[in-house]
A protein has these predicted regions:
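An alpha-helical, amphipathic repeat domain used for nucleic-acid recognition
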Residues: 1-177
């Protein structure tokens, strides 16, 4: 096919340089680096050797990655606990590590306040009390909150402040728990 080419296979030294380039571009988990290196490696053993070397030099640390990623997604993007956990798992962070990082990041967080802030940001310049009287808009707001990683209970508690029909949302299937 035109436009697609097979990447050049690299030896251990080439993989080392490639891994530094990858990590220089953005933070990656060990699983992500392993996957990217495996595509370019001549030998599978070279991948593990490069990953071990990256860890020895302190360039690759899933604990630090998970901690910073979880706090970034919470503080700067306003996502809820479940969304951050799902994203960490998609980024190939070990489940126990991801759970611990998310628990630490959300330790002293009031989810209701987070939901309020999320709604205020997503529905800027809109009267939520008026908008959410419409069933479709209420359901849409609920789905947005669930997709953003907020629990059903916190989402409904906040939405009740704007629309009495929010109690009926509990019967809907959850977006992703």
């Amino acid at each position: 096919m035109r436009g697609q080419r097979t990447p050049k296979k690299l030896d251990a030294d080439g993989l080392w340089g490639y891994s530094l380039k990858l990590l220089g571009g953005r933070a990656l988990s060990t699983g992500e680096v392993r996957q990217k290196l495996a595509r370019r490696a001549e030998k599978d053993t070279d991948v593990e050797a490069v990953i071990a070397k990256l860890r020895d030099y302190g360039y690759l640390n899933d604990n630090k990655f998970a901690e910073s990623y979880a706090s970034w997604r919470k503080e700067n993007e306003g996502f809820g606990k479940m969304r951050v956990l799902r994203d960490l798992r998609q980024r190939r962070v070990a489940p126990t590590l991801a759970d611990e990082a998310v628990e630490r990041a959300f330790k002293d967080t009031d989810e209701t306040e987070q939901v309020q802030a999320f709604l205020a940001r997503k529905f800027r310049n809109v009267d939520l009390g008026e908008l959410l009287q419409e069933d479709k808009k209420l359901q849409s707001a609920y789905r947005k909150l669930r997709y953003a990683g907020f629990s059903s209970g916190a989402s409904i508690r906040v939405l009740k402040g704007y629309a009495e029909k929010a109690d009926q949302l509990e019967d809907e299937p959850a977006a992703d728990e």
